[in-house]
Amino acid sequence: MKKVYVIGSLNMDLCISAPYCPKGGETLSGSGFIANEGGKGANQAAAAAKSGAEVYMCGCVGADPFGGRLVSALDDAGADTRYVRRAEGVSTGIAVIIVTGGENRIILDKGANAALCEEDIDRALENAGAGDVFLTQSENPVKIVGYALKRAKEKGLLTIFNPAPADPAAAEYFRFADIVVRPALKSC
């Protein structure tokens, strides 16, 4: 069976609905607060694992409770998390999502996602081979995403790139992607 390698983000999604976005200095009552495991990379890995694929997740979380929760959720989904590194001195990535009128507004703190490095990529792809599948997106530093796409392509993997969130610098790495996924809107 082919393997699926996901190199990407792991975030805690903190989502709340509000009638409108508060103005500076204003406190507003919200409702329906949800704390979900997320991050585009973690979501890809969980979905692929739940569909029966052999999935290896590579990413970076903080050495904090949110990081532990994210790794546990991926383990529960059936993904292999041996390539998820716990970084000291940095918090796990957080997405604060405010939903107003059915539309979301997201504030992202990349946190440990920004600590992903070339060594993490090399370690995760060490046993990858031709015909395996590689998924990534843009919630990690764009140069690391580009490095990962290039390494996966060199090893003969089918490379899939979801360039979200949008970063004009990511276009430089489209040449290493067999498939570029058009980003979609997200809701809680």
Describe the residue ranges of each PLM region.
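Beta-strand->loop->alpha-helix junctions that form or flank phosphate-binding loops
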Residues: G32, C58-A63, R82-S91, P163-A164
